[in-house]
């Protein structure tokens, strides 16, 4: 059925359910799993009143974000290994979440994308919801959205 399944995670509870579902699907299909999280770049403000940080401070913050992202995909790997599913882990640094998901699926030759319908609350939910919509409308491979 599927050979390689990409699952996008942001660490939210619904996202964790999507990971579990993707792992089960990979196990049933004897497919490889690609666990992906997208980490934003530190925003640089060019507007008056914006707080400028030293490049070393920005690098430190981004490194922390990458560590957090790595922890998320490491958890995917741990869960997949328990089920005997081979997983490849990807932490992508991008401000364009949907594009990063689509690009990772293409790069790793995935034939299915699994993601949660939402995970965050408030403004982040609104923004990430639009990311999900972008993946749904721009992906050339099937997308499974879990609620």
Question: For the regions a protein language model found, what residue spans apply to each?
Answer:
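Small/aliphatic-rich secondary-structure junction motif
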Residues: 3-55, 79-88
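Gly/Ser-rich helix-loop-strand patches that form or flank binding pockets
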Residues: 24, 106-147
